[in-house]
Amino acid sequence: YFEENDFYERCLKKEKSIFLIKDSKINHKGNSSVKNIFKDEIEINRNWHLMWSTFYFYEKHFGKITAYKKVLPKLFSAFLKMLFFIIINNKKKRKIYSARLSGIFNSITGNKSWFRPNITKL
């Protein structure tokens, strides 16, 4: 989720030029190719990888302190939201915020980006 940012930072460090096309337009249709039965699982996957990538990117380019500053508010927010959705029994949202927590913890502890969606169901 931070591929463009990572590429940008690496170019800056190597003093390479970056070109911006100001009038470019991209028509991105989100997860329009994903079957409806997989949408929830893909959303969980997206949230896990977003949080994992956040810590990984900031640690790689700016160090652990900056990475912690970026993810600690997200960690506390995800934890509180997960508790809230447990209390009100919203399983879908609980899974999303559990995935966010898992992504952050896995990145902080140095684990590789291992999470994959469970899309084997028919």
Residue ranges and their predicted role:
Residues W52-S53, K74-L122:
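Terminal low-complexity segments of carbohydrate-biosynthetic enzymes
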